[in-house]
């Protein structure tokens, strides 16, 4: 593509030599923040979101060329196709309509196979509201007539990571005296055992989240949870009718497989539907978010949807040059494809967002970790980066050393809020002072003269200064984005998540890959199913490669079958 070639030429001639510190110290430095930041009033409820991307190795020509690349890649056309319900998930022949789940336009019409999906979406939301309000108010009782106090979401992948992250992020909007939320995802029995250890079965509600209701990890955990529950309420000493009634009051399903759901013992009316045009990693906006609604209340859940909807409208209707997801996506392409950066760090300076990096580790890597183009040909360029991160300031005392002085360039997103929900003393000011300082330090660095002056003031000898000098120099010129919310609320969280979702979409279109399938998760699952029967006897295994045979046989010879 000509636009890629133009960017490559720009990178070789100018881009790779851009020094941010010199740019800020130049005659144009005073306007660099203004030129390369966007303050967008997403909505009255969300408020302003500030994206400062001035601390990147870019100039105006860089951005102009990146916007040309976006247009040539048909980002706008593909964006419109997604919102209109066209089947852009070509390998599964599906629409991609997580945006429809949060569409707040009362007159919206979005069709899939000729049918408007909006009425179905709103019907499920109404059902979620009715159910969550009954449970939270105490109207819905457990089998002994006690009020539900704990909800356990059993799922994996998108059926787990989204609700886990959002309930943590919105913890300030919950009341643990009304409802506590727990999550089980890992097939390791320890996860379930430790979760239910201190729960009372009479006041616990289980949500089984599986679209097909056949996901091995989820159904195995659900069956074990059911066994624990039945044993706790009396086991075989309790009649079948009582057991059936108890299961009906303590288990609900998020699924499309009514036959398997009812076979499990869950009542049909306690099954919450979602659709095949909702990818797992985009499903927190659907019935998969039921645990969120139970934890913080349906009003806050709908505010969460509304915030995402307002970001959707920004993405859909804003010119590329002013479009936050587009700008972030293009910057990622710049580093991935021209600087050869293989990872990106997400660093929220907000403890409530502690699971945000893990959530988008799945969101980004499962979406864009592809090596085949939409036309079936192998890609010839780098695609999805490795996503990782931890909340500040914890990361500063763990891995920032590598970001500052390591050999790898790691673009970083710093996220913070102007206001804290917990303004204890000077805690928030100290937190934000670190937020500001880290991006400045990564950009500016510390040169030899500055280190020499610093050590001289400390009274060190010239010999000692010479010894320490190379160790204390910071090269700087490390790229960062700063994202500022006014306050972390259901609205602003929804907008923030949608911002990252659309950034991932933009990159997938530019790389010409399908961001909405995940065939990479299938092979391991298939092989695990064939291996499982081999673990149930004492026979030596020889049907695999020597390494796999050796591992299986070591396990079998050392375990008590």
Swiss-Prot record:
Entry-linked Pfam families: PGI
Q: Per the UniProt record, which EC number(s) apply here?
A: 5.3.1.9
Gene Ontology CC annotations of this record: cytosol
**Any idea where this protein resides?**
Cytoplasm
What general EC class does the enzyme of this chain belong to?
Answer: isomerase
Q: Main site of residence?
A: cytoplasm
Question: Which PANTHER family does the UniProt entry name for this protein?
Answer: GLUCOSE-6-PHOSPHATE ISOMERASE (PTHR11469:SF1)
Q: Record's NCBIfam families?
A: PRK00179.1
- Return the protein name: Glucose-6-phosphate isomerase
Species assigned in the record: Dictyostelium discoideum
